[in-house]
Amino acid sequence: MRTAALLAVPALMLAGCSKADRDAAGGEGEGVPVGATAEEYQAALGDMEPVELTYQVSASSAESSSGQREEAFADAVEEMSGGAITLDIVYGNAVVPPDEISSALADGRLDLAHWLTSYHADEMKAFTNLQDALVSVETSPLQGEIVSHFTAQEVAFNTPEIMEEFDAHGMTVLNPYNTFGSTALACTSEKGSPADFDGDQIRANAAAQSQQIDALGGSTVTLQLAETYEGLQRNVLQCTFGSPTSMVMSGWLETAGNVYMPKDSSFVSGPGSIVAGSSWDGLPLAAQQLIYDQIVAYNTGELGNAFVSAIAAAQASTESGGSGMHFLDSESEEALKAGNQRILDAVAESENLDGQQLLTDVEESAAKWADIAEELGYTDEGDYLDFADWYAGNGDVMDPEYVGPIVDRFY
């Protein structure tokens, strides 16, 4: 039964010799056992010529909060392999623009990449259904972030139609769904009811966000990420969707310091995926396994980045003279929930997969991860505006002592 398989993820997905077994079948040479040490990996890679893999990411620099997770991933790969595998991180999509990443992975200009999956809704229709299905997950600074993070990855890996879409692009998936944190709405003025959104031009970065904008009473604008800062400054835009990471990194909060999150549901996210291209099949099996195994470091940094960025966004939004980071008012929340229900109804009727099963999978996975988070002590003690006061982590992006227990449960 598919639901039973879902609840066992990623154990079933990664069963066998290593977490890499699912997609590493094409690799040559001997693999390593589960829990292999650095010494075992290095022995297995002893006959491999050192290799440098070009890894393009959207983070602006190594020093940025999102860049720190990339550096941690690369460092873990190099250390575990004894220098046999290194990742050359290219920041800011400097090799190719986002719409050329797929072809660059295919022709070898890139080996690994952060692919902006949400930009390809026409090609990734089942994936887009998952984006939309996740609006049913409740939002909160700590537990909600954890639940949405692992629910998205778990369901993506367990939905054959989604994995087939990556396969059709010649991609091997390392991390199917990452968002830089839950999606928020940053506005140039305070919003206390749906009437305050009336006539606002709101930038969307995912297809179904237009339905959420309609529900709130605004009008949808499509604008490139790089143009959003100026759009807010010139009042072409009154609000924009985005992750707290993007808001801080792009300076949007200087002008749009009134940030809103839903509570009983979610805004549609604009995620990306960590994928490998055509060169993957040329790596020895042990090398593939090693890279897969070190995605744990990436996930640790992804969660840490989400927490740190939420704190930074709350602080930056008040420092800019805005009202800070809040949950939507109750009337706007109800309007959004009505819009989200229309999104969920469309998922249920999807022609791309069994939409009703997808909704069930998301519901069950979210409940599972909420229970696990509760069990491990990840509970919300306040809201976004005072998150810095009650967050129990050390405030660093890479905080394995705090984030490690929940990441380890996934793997």
Where are the language model's segments positioned?
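Pocket-flanking alpha-helical
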Residues: 67, 90-133, 184-188, 240-256
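Extracytoplasmic "Venus flytrap"
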Residues: 26-71, 92-96, 246-247
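Bilobed "Venus flytrap"/periplasmic-binding protein-like clamshell domains
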Residues: 47, 51-85, 167-238, 244, ...
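Contiguous mixed-secondary-structure segments that line small-molecule binding/active-site clefts
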Residues: 31-41, 106, 117-201, 205-216, ...
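Bacterial signal peptide processing site
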Residues: 17-21
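Pocket-lining segment of extracytoplasmic ligand-binding domains
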Residues: 219-326
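Bacterial N-terminal signal peptides that target proteins for export
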Residues: 1-5
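C-terminal motif of bacterial Sec signal peptides marking the signal peptidase cleavage site
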Residues: 12-16
